[in-house]
């Protein structure tokens, strides 16, 4: 099992964070995969989550001899469709709840696209509070867990750097991600791909769940829509995801 920090993340320098692009993230992952192959002499199973899954699909397309399979958890596939789905979800939830505070937050967020950190984080807060990121956890609970984990890993000063870098990367990547569309130029993989989606994930349309596995070329493919799970399916239903990883 190998973990790594993407370029600009964690305690990296500001220069590293400012150099991030989607293409650079793909190239970095390809370099890591080659390094793992050279070090271990084995092919690897790539486990990617959200945008990380999208990056994995792009990287593995070009490294077929290094990778055994890909597990893609809630991959970002089409930003325009996803943003429209989320906006519609917010409108529906606001009308159903008849909650002035929720309505105010939705109105303040406005229509997509969300190309700055404040809007992106505001949307993330709403998604979490409405139960579509992790079941049973609101934004504050997820934020607390994340901060505690960062402090354990980086210490206080390191966490401050990591949070700074998070904002820098968002500012750099968000405008670029508006045009993200895997359907327009789908990856062509030579290894099996296993897609996992959460049934309560407002970011992923049902049409994307159906279309993505059919669009991306691969010698074998599975796709599962997991009940009682949001965007972070691996946290909500770890046993299901573990069983997929074991057999991948």
Segments (PLM) and residue ranges:
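Conserved acidic catalytic loop of the alpha/beta-hydrolase fold
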Residues: 24-44
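Conserved hydrolase catalytic core segment
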Residues: 42-81
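A catalytic-pocket lid/entrance helix-loop region that shapes and gates access to the active site
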Residues: 67-112
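Alpha/beta-hydrolase
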Residues: 97-184, 191
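Short beta-strand/loop motif that positions the catalytic acidic residue
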Residues: 189, 195-197, 201
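Conserved alpha/beta-hydrolase "acid-adjacent" motif
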Residues: 202-208
